[in-house]
Amino acid sequence: MARIAGVNIPTNKRVVIALQYIHGIGQKNAAEIIDKVKIPADRRVSQLSDQEVLQIREVIDRDYLVEGDLRREVGINIKRLMDLGCYRGLRHRRGLPVRGQRTHTNARTRKGPAKSIAGKKK
């Protein structure tokens, strides 16, 4: 198994698919990476040379924010919104949907399990 950005990527998959196991790299970024390194799209991870793996590592380290760094950046951005006290920050603080979804019904994923209210009848 090749280890890139602290993640063991599967050896039996194509490189484009295997790179997507790294948090922060999706289809588009994976395709860009193999284009920069000039690896054929149908090549499997097990067929990569050590030099190619090293080149992929260098491209990711140089050009992309991945794994822990990306998670930290997102957390900092959310904390900044909460500290500003803007609408999006308040929604994050209260654990409600941030992007305008309805909350009268639904939004159970964001709000958590339903809380029963004593004495309320249908």
Curated annotation (Swiss-Prot):
Tell me which Gene Ontology terms the entry assigns under biological process. translation
Matches recorded under Pfam families? Ribosomal_S13
Could you confirm whether the keyword Hydrolase appears in this record?
Answer: no
User: Which GO MF terms does the UniProt record name?
Assistant: rRNA binding; structural constituent of ribosome; tRNA binding
**Disulfide bond residue pairs:** none
Q: Which UniProt keywords apply?
A: Ribonucleoprotein, Ribosomal protein, RNA-binding, rRNA-binding, tRNA-binding
Residue span of region Disordered: 95-122
GO CC, one annotated term: small ribosomal subunit
Query: What is the recorded function of this protein according to its Swiss-Prot or TrEMBL entry?
Result: Located at the top of the head of the 30S subunit, it contacts several helices of the 16S rRNA. In the 70S ribosome it contacts the 23S rRNA (bridge B1a) and protein L5 of the 50S subunit (bridge B1b), connecting the 2 subunits; these bridges are implicated in subunit movement. Contacts the tRNAs in the A and P-sites.
User: What family is reported?
Assistant: Belongs to the universal ribosomal protein uS13 family.
Q: Subunit structure, briefly? A: Part of the 30S ribosomal subunit. Forms a loose heterodimer with protein S19. Forms two bridges to the 50S subunit in the 70S ribosome.
- Its recorded name reads Small ribosomal subunit protein uS13
Source organism per entry reads Nitrobacter hamburgensis (strain DSM 10229 / NCIMB 13809 / X14)
